[in-house]
């Protein structure tokens, strides 16, 4: 069994990252996390090298004329085209659509494994943030095999490309730092994964 999935820090970091990508920065789920990242205490608790985290921590605290809620709206809601859409099927489907074949494959996998996960409104299950929250839930419930499959089959095949584009187009230091923190953290997870990551073509 992959030991990193059994550590408490995996579930904690997956839940923190998932919430910050999924919920508004003003929400009750996320507002305390935003404040924590604006201080320096979090670095000692994050399972990455302090030297790698230092520039990320500095960027979190960099001032921007655009407010955090405005940046959230622009990056995740619209009304204009999102610079880096957070749904897997946008990257994995030839037509770059929501609810694409990869979303249906994720739903089938969830049904086969008896996994039910509540989404906000009528939203695809393959949102980057919601997949991280699901990974945290699986780890917390000792379903490490399913957690490995979720990461290797349904998240890692597209997450690196999503994060690269997200960082390049974030346009706000907080979300640029969040993208970098996610990229560093997921790279460490992937390096420790036992089962191979599925190779899937990307269309963005």
From Swiss-Prot:
Keywords noted in UniProt: Chaperone
Top-level taxonomic group: Bacteria
GO CC, one annotated term: cytoplasm
Gene3D superfamilies found in the cross-reference section: TorD-like
Binding partners and assembly: Monomer in solution.
HAMAP family (UniProt xref): DmsD_chaperone (MF_00940)
Record protein name field: Tat proofreading chaperone DmsD
Organismal lineage: Bacteria, Pseudomonadati, Pseudomonadota, Gammaproteobacteria, Enterobacterales
